[in-house]
């Protein structure tokens, strides 16, 4: 049985950060286990190619489960009035399905979903964090989590009290100026206010997203947090390795049994499995 101080199950968005932070202590031995492969596929790193990742065996293709007790029929609403650019108005019917499902892909590769998502950088709404704190979750108010957002990012677009510089995660403006994007934002501004920064003091409105990219390439959690430290002597990374069983001692996860394409391994943590 191979022993480590910490075993991290899942080399996704959070797992890569944990591996980075825990191995800052040279006396701490860490093992990171990811069921997917290394993030070598060029489709991951070229931003425009994320639309083609669906067939690359790097994604868990989940669907949401329809809510119970909803009708199976398609419900019709009243007609909607649509105006074109020439001022002509059309009336079209609207309908929706109560039993509809939503496609929810998740990454199966180093970096997890941060390696396969659309790279949009949008923080949660302040109200949500403050509400969590009001419910009794100490340390989760927006004021308390903001320093960690700032610590994580290197924002190329904004430099103020709400944004950070020098962090591992690069946040940039979109490099491609698509005129149709500007047309869409202009149209949206007719019914809602413009907002140049969804992560600023006001988080609502219509505008252009910031993206997690650096020098025109995806800046995933693996790129930002894992690649710079992957050669640390106190870090072991297993890819293409699936954890089959987590073993507990009382309420603490202490060891895992995992299988790869070439071996079956039993790993134990002195501290805990995360």
PLM ranges: what are they?
Residues 1-268:
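N-terminal redox-cofactor-binding region of secreted/periplasmic oxidoreductases
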Residues 269-274:
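A short, hydrophobic C-terminal helix/tail in secreted or cell-surface proteins
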């Amino acid at each position: 049985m191979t022993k480590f101080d910490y075993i991290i199950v899942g080399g996704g968005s959070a797992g890569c950060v944990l591996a980075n932070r825990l191995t800052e202590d040279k006396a701490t031995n860490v093992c990171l286990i990811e069921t997917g492969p290394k993030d070598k596929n060029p489709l991951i790193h070229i931003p425009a190619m994320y639309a083609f990742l669906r067939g690359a065996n790097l994604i868990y293709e989940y669907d949401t489960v329809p809510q119970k007790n909803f009708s199976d029929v398609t419900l019709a609403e009243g007609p909607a009035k649509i105006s074109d650019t020439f001022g002509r108005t059309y009336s079209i019917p609207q309908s929706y399905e109560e039993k509809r499902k939503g496609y929810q892909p998740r990454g199966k590769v180093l970096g997890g979903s941060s390696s396969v998502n659309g790279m949009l950088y949008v923080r949660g709404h302040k109200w949500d964090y403050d509400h969590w704190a009001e419910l009794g979750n100490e340390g989760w108010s927006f004021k308390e989590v903001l320093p960690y957002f700032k610590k994580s990012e290197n924002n190329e677009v904004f430099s103020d009290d709400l944004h950070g510089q020098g962090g591992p995660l690069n946040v940039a403006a979109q490099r491609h100026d698509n005129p149709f994007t500007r047309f869409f934002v202009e149209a949206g501004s007719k019914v809602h206010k413009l907002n140049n920064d969804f992560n600023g003091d006001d988080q609502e409105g219509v505008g252009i997203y910031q993206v997690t990219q650096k020098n025109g390439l995806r800046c995933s959690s693996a790129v930002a947090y894992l690649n710079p430290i992957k050669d640390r002597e106190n870090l072991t990374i297993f890819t293409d390795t699936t954890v089959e069983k987590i073993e507990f001692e009382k309420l603490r996860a202490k060891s895992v049994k995992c299988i790869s394409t070439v071996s079956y391994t039993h790993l134990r943590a002195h501290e805990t499995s995360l």
